[in-house]
UniProtKB/Swiss-Prot annotation:
MF annotations from Gene Ontology: metal ion binding; metalloendopeptidase inhibitor activity
S-S bridge residues: C9-C23, C15-C51, C27-C38
InterPro entries: MCP_Inhibitor_Domain_sf
Name this protein carries in UniProt: Metallocarboxypeptidase inhibitor b
Amino acid sequence: FHVPDDRPCIKPGRCPLVPDATCTFVCKAADNDFGYECQHVWTFEGQRVGCYA
């Protein structure tokens, strides 16, 4: 399996708690049919942030 590279989110929506955060679509290997799983990761100034209280 080839795990896709990290890339900008296509439709990131927004991050209510940190409006200036950057969205990245991050994929990692996983034990499923695709061989990987992906998630939206929000970061601000190099730190991962939560977008919802």
